[in-house]
């Protein structure tokens, strides 16, 4: 189930990149957020209640973080191979796991990840989009904030209701950006169909699979399995998008995967999905 979730998310990201020429990265974000929110709303509508006070503040903040992470990550995807972008973004959950640990040995994971990131940023001696690297790292920092805020939201608004409302808020936030880039092309049948696929693959399906997996697996095992995501992204990018990686980039991704697995196993807590 965890592997299925990972493959679903990365397939959704690969599908989203096919929309970039028509509606731009931000148009694709609008499709993902909008259809993802509608899918969640279908499951939570009957039990949904309006937030108030602290709940409302946590929901709005969570929605803003979701919007920022997706906008920056999809811009990074427009400039970098899928595997590279996802690997760089993974500094978020890795950082949260390490900062939450008080063990000095966890600095080893930081060092491993740092080497991997430097190798990726260097592009293996070839051309690399520096802005894409920066955007992916910003998205990773946002994912770290997402993890922290996810815990806060879960305490203030238990269940999927808070996430559903946050996704709706994120959709409202990204709408001006998506409409500015996508324009009338967002209303075409092919874009809407692909957007629905992105929303389901990137949000609804992985959430369902991960919730079921968390009921069956220890947190540490779940976290280690989730750390395979950069490798899965590289594989999907190679198969679906014909994105070849240099040997040094493969090694760099392997270093970040190893660092993430070690840090998440040590922390013993899973990294929530970033929207």
What residue ranges belong to the model's regions?
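Helix-helix packing/entry segments at the starts of transmembrane helices
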Residues: 86-88, 149-171, 203-239
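Juxtamembrane helix-entry segments on the extracytoplasmic side of multipass membrane proteins
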Residues: 22-26, 30, 51-56, 122-145, ...
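Membrane-interface interhelical linkers
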Residues: 1-4, 37-61, 102-108, 125-126, ...
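Specific transmembrane alpha-helical segments of multi-pass solute transporters/efflux pumps
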Residues: 8, 44-85, 117-119, 199-217
């Amino acid at each position: 189930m965890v592997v299925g979730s990972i493959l679903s998310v990365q397939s959704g990201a690969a599908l989203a990149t096919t929309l970039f020429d028509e509606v731009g990265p931000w148009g694709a974000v609008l499709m993902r957020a909008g259809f993802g929110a509608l899918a969640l709303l279908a499951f939570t509508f009957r039990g949904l209640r309006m937030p108030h006070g602290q709940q409302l503040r946590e929901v709005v903040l969570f929605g803003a973080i979701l919007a920022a992470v997706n906008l920056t990550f999809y811009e990074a995807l427009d400039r970098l191979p899928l595997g590279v972008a996802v690997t760089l973004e993974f500094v978020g959950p890795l950082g949260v796991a390490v900062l939450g640990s008080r063990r000095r040995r966890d600095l080893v994971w930081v060092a491993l990840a740092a080497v991997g990131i430097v190798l990726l940023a260097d592009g293996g001696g070839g051309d690399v989009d520096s802005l894409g690297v920066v955007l992916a790292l910003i998205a990773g920092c946002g994912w770290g904030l997402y993890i922290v805020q996810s815990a806060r939201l879960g305490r203030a608004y238990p269940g999927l209701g808070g996430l559903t409302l946050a996704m709706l808020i994120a959709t409202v936030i990204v709408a001006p950006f998506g409409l500015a880039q996508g324009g009338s092309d967002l209303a075409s049948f092919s874009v809407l169909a692909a957007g629905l696929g992105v929303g389901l693959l990137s949000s609804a399906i992985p959430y369902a699979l991960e919730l079921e997996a968390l009921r069956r697996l220890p947190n540490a095992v779940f976290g280690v399995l989730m750390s395979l995501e950069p490798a899965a992204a590289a594989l999907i990018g190679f198969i679906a998008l014909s994105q070849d990686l240099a040997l040094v980039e493969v090694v760099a991704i392997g270093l970040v995967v190893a660092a993430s697995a070690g840090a998440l196993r040590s922390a013993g807590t899973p990294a929530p999905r970033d929207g």
